[in-house]
Amino acid sequence: MNSVKRYLWFSQASLIICLLICYLMLPSVMDHNGGASNFGDGFPTVIPYALGFALSAVLLWVAASKLSQMEQKIRKTAALVTTIGVLDLLVLLTTFDRKANHVYYLVHDYLGAALFAYEFALSVWIVYKTKSYATGLFLLVGSIGSLLGLLSLVGPLRLLFAGQMIGGIGFGLVLTVGFPSVIAALG
């Protein structure tokens, strides 16, 4: 169980740290209300951007592999973690072609929306299962970040990347703190 928890932490930390490195390399993304995907557009930020998403996906799959080796009730949760990794990888892969034409752009945006929706739904489920004040607070943080991102897309705010980061940190905390509690309750 400890190895699953460790891989979940590393998956979320690698993504957040790599995106923060991207921001330090190219802070102007915030000036143009750009999202994290803009870091995948060119050198030098494409390297930590791709590394962050790829590492996150691989580490999530390792955690899922460990879950799939546990008792039957726990094994079923491996698919929940695998799905996040698949969506992370698809968002990464569609980043590079999104400016080629409108179809690629839409595919990337819809996959990003699917990742957000899945992470939000999973977070709500984890909070419901744990009934923990801490995971509820982390869900609130993620929701505030997501709201900032949404208002940046449709309104006057220019905080898309900040909203994505706050939302991602909130989800990462729900996943790394709450999900192991759900697994422990099943075992």
How would you label these PLM feature ranges?
Residues 1-73:
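N-terminal topogenic module of multi-pass integral membrane proteins
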Residues 1-4, 65-78, 128-136, 186-187:
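Membrane-interface helix-boundary motifs at transmembrane edges
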Residues 13-19, 48-63, 114-125, 168-182:
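Hydrophobic cores of alpha-helical transmembrane segments in multi-pass inner/ER membrane proteins
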Residues 41, 101-113, 159-168:
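Non-cytosolic membrane-interface motifs at loop->transmembrane helix junctions
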Residues 67-90, 154-155:
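Cytoplasmic juxtamembrane regions at transmembrane-helix boundaries
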Residues 68, 93-102, 149-158:
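Juxtamembrane "helix-exit" motif on the non-cytosolic side of transmembrane helices
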Residues 82-136:
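Membrane-proximal helix-loop-helix units in multi-pass membrane proteins
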Residues 128-187:
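Terminal transmembrane helical module of multi-pass membrane proteins
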